[in-house]
């Protein structure tokens, strides 16, 4: 695997999806996760509405349980009209891109519980369409 000498800022601002290149066995320091989160919450929000909270999970059993839940929910997601499987259905120009994206997303669904950290984003309030 090629290693790039990028700062967290550079990696977050120049790197596209990397699901298939994740090193699930490499430890990640809390400070790196925190820096990523600090950068992420700089995105603008309407009416200064930062209606979010985050839970960082590093406990191996809890990560495995979250990964299992994610994997079991995957087939239900795949059936939704706006899933990666259906969003561009019939668009021949998107066939290769969709195939790469679905393969990558399926890989993440199978391996999420192995990630050294899982960040769970929570929104304040209730979404009635859930």
Range-by-range predicted roles:
Residues 42-45, 75:
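A generic secondary-structure boundary signal that marks alpha-helix termini
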Residues 46-48, 111:
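A short catalytic or substrate-binding loop motif that flags glycine-/basic-rich loops and adjacent residues
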């Amino acid at each position: 695997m090629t290693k790039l000498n990028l700062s967290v800022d550079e990696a977050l601002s120049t790197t596209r999806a990397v699901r298939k290149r994740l090193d699930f066995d490499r430890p990640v320091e809390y400070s790196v996760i925190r820096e990523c989160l600090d950068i992420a919450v700089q995105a603008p929000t309407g009416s200064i509405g930062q209606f979010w909270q985050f839970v960082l999970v590093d406990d191996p059993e809890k990560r495995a349980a979250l990964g299992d839940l994610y994997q079991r929910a995957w087939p239900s997601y795949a059936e939704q009209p706006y899933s990666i499987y259906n969003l561009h259905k019939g668009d021949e120009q998107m066939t290769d891109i969709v195939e790469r994206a679905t393969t990558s997303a399926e890989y993440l669904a199978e391996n999420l519980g192995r990630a050294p950290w899982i960040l769970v984003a929570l929104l304040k309030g209730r979404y009635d369409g859930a």
